[in-house]
Amino acid sequence: MTDYKATLNLPDTAFPMKAGLPQREPQILQRWDSIGLYQKLREIGKDRPKFVLHDGPPYANGKIHIGHALNKILKDMIVRSKTLAGFDAPYVPGWDCHGLPIEHKVEVTHGKHLSADRTRELCREYAAEQIEGQKTEFIRLGVLGDWDNPYKTMNFANEAGEIRALAEMVKQGFVFKGLKPVNWCFDCGSALAEAEVEYADKKSQTIDVAFPVADEAKLAAAFGLASLAKPAAIVIWTTTPWTIPANQALNIHPEFKYALVDTGERLLVLAEELVESCLKRYNLEGSVVASAQGSALELINFRHPFYDRLSPIYLADYVELGAGTGVVHSSPAYGEDDFVTCKRYGMVNDDILTPVQSNGVYVDSLPFFGGQFIWKANPAIVEKLSEVGALMHTETISHSYMHCWRHKTPLIYRATAQWFVGMDKQPSTGEPLRERALKAIEDTKFVPAWGQARLHAMIANRPDWCISRQRNWGVPIPFFLHKQTGDLHPRTVELMEEVAKRVEQQGIEAWFKLDAAELLGAEADQYDKIADTLDVWFDSGTTHWHVLRGSHDIGHATGPRADLYLEGSDQHRGWFHSSLLTGCAIDNHAPYRELLTHGFTVDENGRKMSKSLGNTIEPEKVNNTLGADILRLWVSATDYSGEMAVSEQILQRSADAYRRIRNTARFLLSNLSGFDPARDLLAPEDMLALDRWAVDRTLLLQRELEEHYSEYRFWNVYSKVHNFCVQELGGFYLDIIKDRQYTTGANSVARRSCQTALYHISEALVRWIAPILAFTADEIWQYLPGERNESVMLNGWYQGLSELPEGTELDRAYWDRVMAVKASVNKELENQRTAKVIGGNLQAEVTLYADEGLSADLGKLGDELRFVLITSAASVVPFAQAPAEAVATEVEGLKLQVVKSGHTKCGRCWHFRADVGSHPEHPEICGRCVDNLTGSGEVRHYA
C-alpha cells in the first residue's frame, strides 16, 4: 500500500503548542528590554497625535495585590491599543511616597526615639526599596512604560513642583488658616483626609440629657404662657457623651414644632413628633401643655448640666426627627455642623472650647474629667449627669461610625488650627473652587457614566479641604507666620519659589534644615517657620501639574491635561477628587478629559478578598503557575464597571479560553508553512470566493474591535475575538479549507488563495490580541512569514484587509445563509455519528431538499458544495421532492437527508468517491487526487 502522506501539504510550524508562559514570558521581557521597545515607541511616535494616560500613583508600601495588577493591566491595554491606533501614548508609572504608613513602618522597625531628620532619611530609603519590589512585579505583568524613569512624589523635582503648585494656589487666594473641626486620629496624631476615613460598626453609649432653663420668662413667652408653673428643661440626645464637657449651644430646627410637656416634677421641651417615644424611653407619663414653632425658641438660654455656663438655642436645618429628641447638643470644636452654626451666630475662635488634646486625653484643667482618655471618660460623664439629675436615659447601641483606614480605630472631629483650601472662598480672580469644580465635572466624560453624579455629589457637599498634617515624612508647607499677627509673610509666594529651588537640589530636607535668616535676613526674628506638612492627597493630587508639565513633560503642548485618569471607584473621593480641586484651582479646568472607574475584585461568591477568608489571589503566584497573559485575559474578559470576580477556578477558565486562541494562532501559522508574502500573496480579485469572504469578515470585525478598544470595552474585544477563533474560524472557515490546503498543489491558486487569506487573518489577529495577550502576541509575531520589525507593538492596526466589492454575487448575506445550512448539516451529521450510522463526516453523503431561492444559492457552488459541508457528496434537490424520512431544519425551506456512502475511501484525501481505483497506477486514490499529483491539478472557484 502506497503512503501518500508525503504528497500532502501538511501543517508545519515551530510555534509551540504548549505555551509554557511562566518560563517564556520572562524571556520575552528580556527581549523587549534588549531592543529598547519603549524607547523605540517614543521615537516612532514623536510626530503622532498624543494620548496621555496619567498614572495614579500606588503607595510605595508592600507587595502588589490583585487590585494593583488589575489596575496596571487595564492601563497597559489602553496604552497599547492607543499605540496601535496611531497615537503617541507614553506611560510614565508613578509612586506615592510620603505619609504616615511609611513613617509608621520606620517607627515600628527603628523605634520612636529617632530624630525627625533621621526619620525622613529612613522613610526615603524604605520607600525606594518598596518601589523597586513593586516595579519588578508590575514589569512582570507585561506593562510597558518608562520604568527607568518613573515619577515619585519623593523625587526632588516632584517635591519642588508640589511646593510650586501650592504657591500657585496661595497666589490665587485659595489657601487660608483656620480653626475647624477635621477628621482626627489619635493614633496618627494628625488630621486625616476624607479618603482616609472608612466606616465600621461601633458600640456607643447613647444618653438623653436635660439642660435646665435659664431664661424662664422667655421660654414661657415662646410657648404663649404667662409663666412656667414648675422647673423646665430641654432634652438632647447624643451618641458621644465625651462631647458634653465641650457643649456650648443647643440646636433645634426652625420649622419643627416643639412641645412643652408636663411630666409631673418638671416641664420638658421635646420635638412634638417625638414626645410619645421619648416619654416611653424615660418611663414617664406626661401631657403637652403648649407647643411652639422652633424659630420662636431662638436664643433662649439653658444651663449646662454640670458647668456654670449657658447654652443658648441656635436654629439649624440639619436637625432631624429620627432617633433622639429633635434637639441637638452643640460642641463646635467637635462637630462640623455645630462649628458652622456657632460661627454663624457670631462665636469667635477664641471662645470655642477645645478640651481634647491631640492624643485624645482631656486637658488636665478640665473639671471632673481632666487627664482622662475620652472613650474611657464616657462612664464617668454619664455618672456625673446622673448625679446632678440631668440623665434621662442611657443605653448602648451599635452603629456605623468613622474609623482610621490605617489603625481601624474610631476617629473624632476635632477643631485645630490647620491650613485649608477654601471651597467657597472668593479667589483673587474667577469663581470659587466649588463652582469651578462642578463646572469641570460637566465637561468631563465618565466611564461608566454614573461616576459623574457620584463625584458631583461629593464636590457639592464637601467641606473646605484641610491640607496640613503634623508629621515628619511629607512635603513641607513652607510658610513663615508673623509672631504677633499670625499673618503670612507678604512675600510668601516669592519665598516659596526660593524654597522650591532648594528642595529641587536637596529634597524636602532643605526646608527642615533651613535657617529662616537665610531667606528673611533681619526679619527672621519676627516670624515663625512652620513645621506642618502637606496631606498626601495634595502630593498625588498635584502630579498633573508637576509631572505632566514638569519632571516628565509628557503632557500635551496645550498644557498639563491628561486624556485619561483610570483608577478604582474609591478614587472618586481620593485621587480623582484631589486632582480635580488642584486642577481647577490652578488651571481652572479638570486635569483630565475622561475618568474611567473600575470596580473592586471579589471572589466567585461575591465576597471581598481577605487573607482571613483565604480567598486572595496573588499576582506573583498566577504569573508563576499560569502566566501573566492568563491574568491579562481575565482582566479583558471581565466587565470592570462593577465588582470583578476572580478565583483559581475563574482563572482556569481564562486559561482554557487562552488555549483556544493559541491553538487558532498555531493552526494559522502551521498552514503558512512555505508561504512567502513577497512571492506568494494573491491580489483579492485572484482569490477564491470563500477566502475573499474570510478576509472581508476579518475587516468588518477589525472595525468593531477598533471601536471597542477606543471606548475601553475590553470584554467585548475578548468575546468577539474568542468567538471569531472558535466559531467563524474554527467552526467554519478553517475546517472547510483543510482539504484544499492539504491536497491541492503546493503552488496552486487554490492553496495560495487560502494561504493569502490565512496570512491576512494572522496579521490582523496578532494585532487584535496585542493589547491583551501582550506576551503571546509578540511570540506569534516572531513566527509570522515575511520581513517584519522586532515587535508587533511597533506597528498599527493591520491595513492589508480588503472588503468584498459592491455587487459581489457571493456576498456577506450569501455566506451567512451557507453558514446556516452548514450548521443544520453538522447537527444531523452528529446525530448519525451518535447512532453509529457513519464513523466520520466524510463517510456521509448529504441530500439537501431546498426551496427555489435556497436551491439557486446552493447551486452556485456546484460540486464544491461538498467541500463546504465537508461530506463526500452533496446534492441539491427541489424541496417538494423531500421524502418522509428527510429531516426538517431550522433553515426555512430546507430539509436534508444523510446516508452512509457506499463508495471506497480515498487513501489520500479520505473522501469516499466512486472513482477510487479507476486509475491503474494509483488504485487507492480518487481521480481528483490523481489529477493533483500527476496532472494539471484541480481547479477551485469558490471553496
Curated annotation (Swiss-Prot):
L-isoleucyl-5'-AMP binds at E567. ATP binds at K611. It is found in: Cytoplasm. GO terms for biological process: isoleucyl-tRNA aminoacylation. Keywords: Aminoacyl-tRNA synthetase, ATP-binding, Cytoplasm, Ligase, Metal-binding, Nucleotide-binding, Protein biosynthesis, Zinc. Belongs to the class-I aminoacyl-tRNA synthetase family. IleS type 1 subfamily. This is Isoleucine--tRNA ligase. The lineage of its organism: Bacteria, Pseudomonadati, Pseudomonadota, Gammaproteobacteria, Pseudomonadales. The gene is ileS.
